[in-house]
Regions:
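Helix-biased detector of long, well-ordered alpha-helical tracts
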Residues: 2-13, 18-372
Length: 372
């Protein structure tokens, strides 16, 4: 299948520079690598997890810090220290509202970093937390969020060991922002990275998509449904342990948060230089979420998830991985939704319900700002 479409992988220019050794940063005397005529300021879409996020990272951030640990652009850095393989990750959370059906910003902050470590195949151990508080924020709200973080950490089996707190003037933040970082141990024999997807691999999703994003949007828009849409935020480390026990040769794991499953799979396709073909009929989505997306004019393929994962697994291990998922409470609705193909490298296509084929690319704009 030939796709006369521009390749949106922006890493080629930066990759050319990677051959030279790392040197101290020089003064920034050149021009900004993103055309000022396009964006003179940061816009919300730069945080969407789509094309503008990718441009921001690949064009401005990565070239200044390029190194072998950063290069894979994984959910975390994986490195060896005194004989142990460790994973290190960080994430920031600005979700609005800070309390929502199924969770709050504190629970999300713990789960998010636990899950990023888990997508590296690591067993999460320790977290840090940084709080940016707006003057005037309710002390009761802050207390509830801290208690929620404690409960989430206990559920995930991790310990919060260090942190920081800052307070800014009224109007200089929106109640509370949280950053969490984490470290975990990668077991021997586990080798998971976005560049390891291979032709013939199966693509599995652990459950119904787009739940978290629509839980947030339902609150924002005041939508009421017969069954409340609650966020799927959850720690995925135990699920990952079950998957790896059944299928230790898993190639890729990814939690499809901002930008949804489409953005996550496009990043994998670009990194591994492969194509990915999805089957729309096989993608699990609840009727409530589907209805909410239709009301708001949103495509669920691009809506954030916080308690789901994508696994790319060799075909011979797919049944074992799928069975392991379905026997775990967080993977009971897991499904094989596609495969890795040699056609259309670096692109994701989807066979539609009516039998056609369409390209599903990253969004350029912002569907859902401040979703996590």
């Amino acid at each position: 299948m030939n796709l006369p479409i521009t390749n949106h992988d922006l890493s080629s220019e930066a990759s050319a520079k990677a051959e030279s050794p790392i040197t101290p940063a020089s003064p920034l005397t050149g021009s900004c690598p993103l055309p000022i005529s396009d964006y003179r300021e940061i816009v919300l879409a730069h945080g969407s997890g789509g094309k503008l996020s990718q441009q921001l990272i690949q064009k401005i951030v990565v070239p200044q810090f390029r190194n072998e640990l950063l290069e894979p652009l994984h959910d975390g850095a994986i490195f060896s220290l005194n004989g142990a393989r460790l994973a290190f990750s960080t994430d920031s959370f600005v979700v609005s509202p800070i309390f929502f059906p199924g969770g709050d910003i504190g629970k999300l902050a713990v789960h998010g970093t636990v899950n990023d470590l888990s997508m590296c195949g690591a067993r999460p151990l320790y977290l840090s937390a940084g709080f940016i508080l707006e003057e005037g924020t309710s002390m009761e709200d802050f207390w509830r969020i801290v208690l929620s973080m404690r409960e989430a950490a206990a559920e995930a089996g991790v310990t919060l060991v260090t942190g920081d707190t800052k307070v800014v003037d009224r109007g200089k933040a929106d109640k509370i922002f949280i950053n969490t970082s984490g470290i975990g141990v990668v077991p021997d024999g586990v080798d998971i990275a976005p560049g390891r997807a291979r032709v013939g691999d199966k693509v599995i999703v652990s459950g119904e998509i787009a739940v978290h994003g629509m839980a947030i949007m339902s609150v924002r828009e005041g939508l009421e449904f017969e069954t409340e849409i609650a966020s799927d935020t959850a720690p995925l480390n135990r699920l990952v342990e079950s998957i790896l026990a059944a299928a230790p040769d898993v190639h890729v794991l990814r939690d499809p948060t901002r930008g949804g499953i489409t953005s996550a799979l496009t990043e994998i396709a670009q990194t591994a230089k492969v194509g990915i073909r999805l089957d729309e009929v096989q993608i699990p989505i609840s009727e409530e979420v589907k209805g909410a997306c239709e009301i708001l004019g949103l495509d669920p393929l691009y809506v954030a998830n916080e308690g789901k994962l994508l696994a790319i697994v060799p075909a011979e291990s797919a049944n074992a991985a799928l069975t392991a998922m379905r026997t775990h409470p967080l993977g009971s609705k897991a499904a094989v939704i596609g495969e890795v193909v040699a056609d259309h490298p670096e692109f994701v296509t989807m066979r539609t319900r009516v039998g056609g084929t369409r390209v599903v690319d990253m969004l350029s704009g912002e569907q859902l700002p401040r979703i996590c």
